[in-house]
Amino acid sequence: MKKSLIAVALLATIGSTNAATIYDKDGTTLDIFGNIEVGYRNANAAKYDKVSSYNSSDSTIMNTAKIGISGRSQINENLYAIGMAQWDVASGDSFDDLKARHQFIGIDAQNYGTLLFGRGDNAFYTVAGVSDIFHDLDFEVSDYYLTGDQNPGLIMYTLSSLGWDLRASFGSAKSNINNTPLNYKYQFAFSGSTRLKSDITISYALAYYKFSYEGDVRDQVAYFAKKMQNMYHLNDNDILAFANANRPEHKIDKGIAISYGTYGDGLYAALNFVSTRYEHYSHHLYSYEAVIDYAFENGLGLTAGYGCKRFHHTNILGDLNLGVRYGVNANFNLFAEAQIDVNSNPEIYYSHEEITDRALAENKILCGAEFLF
């Protein structure tokens, strides 16, 4: 489970429940926080892990950790400087396996909003994130996770007022987006959400990505060529020339979400729908995610959900997720999750390499324990 850039900003603003304050003087505080996780994963779940590189066909026991630091300093009565950084640490033998998650500094102007600069999720996460509640085996069928997830060079402004939460973000140039050959010149996103008196939240978001093609573009063209070949029924001799002449210059995500309750406090349910349009694609991509969770007062939590991604009237991905967790105390949790393939046809859209590397259309199982600090 991830946290949005704004949600993580709250760690710097008000502190985390498990964070340890290491400095508190003259209106400035500094906290450290994180977790250590050890668990069993079958081979497909191990390949799915984004922190560790795992290519074996065997199940394994894996360990990872997250470490973060956050700070807050009062400038005047209504203005605060905030900062935060968080990293994933895989089970390697050195810090070469360190991966940045969120890194930002910013200004919290209270009633006038929060302005952040750094690395994180763009404003579209307001919609995509309502179903991001599983411990590790998230759906990620939404195409948002290809281009908008945890990007550097991001500027985000958030204003919460009169029952509305408004967010706008702009991202500067980025190469090799999320381990793909794709580059974008810039991106921007906007979202708005409101919580009704019935404890229902409704959200809408839009994101635009301008792709960049500079220097040697063969890998980028090949990435789209493999997808366009199935769309336009092209033979191997024509596909590269076709893809180069019709390479997408932009991508647009539009999404809407509705949720009930607050995750971790009794009943929580959410549904989102995302439409994605690549220039020169024959059809839109559509994704749907629905989740339900119940957190009991004794620390037990049960989660279930279904996610699917469709292209040209066909499910290219379909996953049923089940999860259980138990909080032994505020710092120690046990968890287990399963992701079951439901009539996926990834070969219609994805390349063989993507299907293998991401273990698409494969059943995944994991269980483990984590210690929070």
Which role fits each region the language model picked out?
Residues 21-41, 56-173, 182-184, 193-196:
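Outer membrane beta-barrel
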Residues 38-44, 87-91, 119-123, 161-163, ...:
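Transmembrane beta-strands of outer-membrane beta-barrel pores
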Residues 71-73, 107-109, 159-161, 192-196, ...:
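Residue-level signature of outer-membrane beta-barrel architecture
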Residues 75-81, 111-115, 163-168, 197-204, ...:
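Repeated loop/turn-to-beta-strand initiation elements of outer-membrane beta-barrel proteins
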